[in-house]
Amino acid sequence: DLSEPFSNHLCEHLKQNEKQITSSNSKFLNSLKKFNEGKIKLEERNEITKKLGFVNVIDAFHEVNGKTIPKRFFIDERKDSGGIRLTNHFYDLFELQESENFLNEVEARWRLVETAWKLGVAVKLVQVEHDSVGEQFFINTKLGRINVTSSKNALNGYQKSKCFFCFDYISIVKRSLKLCNVDHFFPDTLKSKDFPGYVDGIWNLVLACKECNRGEGGKFAKVPSLKLLERLYKRNEYFCSSHHPLRETIMSQTGQTKEQRTKFLQKCYNSAKKKLIHNWDVEPKGTST
């Protein structure tokens, strides 16, 4: 029975942001708000969720960018049995080492989207900034700063729990021995050196293992190789060509077209090389994402 865990998550998010959909009203969400206010009991909430909670979710689940994904994680059997049947593809997900990071990644995307809706703007208009001390993405508004989500959680979706540089396994789970670092691709020492790009911008942030970030032979204040620069370009293009909530922020920082973004990265590389001189690269420890 998915009704209780599904509605539990929604109720928790409704406590943070009442705006969870683009439409102005929802009978289902209104019922969850009543539960949060203590006006209906758990059993009634779960029954309402069974009737109303999955009307649109199940049909849309396998649709990405207007297309149906090839692997289906469940089969809709509501007409015959009143439920869904999980496929082997679903169970295969939990055999992956990076499955420990799934929940944090989903929560990060959810927080980015609902924050935009709360502010009353389209997701594409949200400009996300980074707090390098707290490793938080935040949004500045007229009423002050709004913390959105962990930068590690938001960035890990593209890297699939692998170090951006060496592809070794990384984790975004606190207290993990493999906990990653948020790293500046172009070193943050460039902030004071008339660098053409915003060094703390999302376009320049990647997740790295401790060895690449600050271990013996790590990157430190060196300039990543052209091979790694190409990897950064591909990462940023992934965000720019998707419906990811960080898309517009990266485009505003690097350029609205592929040509502009290519020239921007090359300009940044040339500037960094002139100022820092030394290149850096690393041998891969795993397969690429």
Can you name each region flagged by the protein language model?
Residues L2, L143, N147-A154, Y158, ...:
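Conserved aromatic-histidine-acidic binding/catalytic patches
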Residues D1-N147, V223-R235:
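Mixed-charge, low-complexity interaction segments
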Residues E129-V148, S176-D194:
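Short, charged low-complexity linear segments at domain edges
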Residues N17, K162, F239-C240:
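Short secondary-structure junctions and interdomain/linker hinges
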Residues A221-T289:
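C-terminal structured domain segments
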Residues F167-L205, G218-R231:
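Histidine-centered nuclease catalytic patch
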Residues T149-N181, C209-C212:
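Short cysteine-rich loop/turn motifs with clustered Cys
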